[in-house]
């Protein structure tokens, strides 16, 4: 969810205007969020606990459709996810700097 948080214009400006209306756009954003979660967990040394959810199959199906229809989608999603992770890390560094100054 924290990767979704980075989307608004005052953060990273990912356009989510069609998220609720367009299944393909929703799948793209969800793929970005999932990759961002994976990248953050790897950076922080967190081993995710996998809990099967009823909607996992539908998420995977939507990602597969996007990835099949657009060969660049995985690279675009990865780039957006990496930008989100870098943004989140920058906030952590800024907060740490503020604590040092205070």
Language-model segment annotations:
Residues 5-31, 50-60:
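Post-HEXXH active-site segment of zinc metalloproteases
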Residues 31-39:
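Short amphipathic alpha-helical face segments that pack within enzyme cores
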Residues 24-26, 38-102:
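Long, well-structured alpha-helical subdomains associated
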Residues 1-3:
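Short alpha-helix carrying the canonical HExxH Zn2+-binding catalytic motif
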């Amino acid at each position: 969810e924290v990767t979704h948080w980075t989307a608004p214009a005052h953060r990273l400006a990912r356009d989510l205007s069609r998220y609720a209306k367009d299944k393909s756009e929703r799948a793209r954003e969800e793929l970005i969020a999932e990759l961002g979660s994976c990248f953050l967990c790897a950076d922080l040394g967190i081993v995710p606990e996998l809990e099967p959810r009823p909607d996992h199959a539908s998420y995977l199906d939507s990602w597969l459709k996007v990835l099949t229809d657009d060969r660049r989608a995985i690279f675009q999603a990865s780039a957006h996810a990496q930008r989100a992770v870098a943004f989140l890390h920058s906030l952590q560094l800024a907060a740490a700097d503020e604590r040092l100054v205070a």
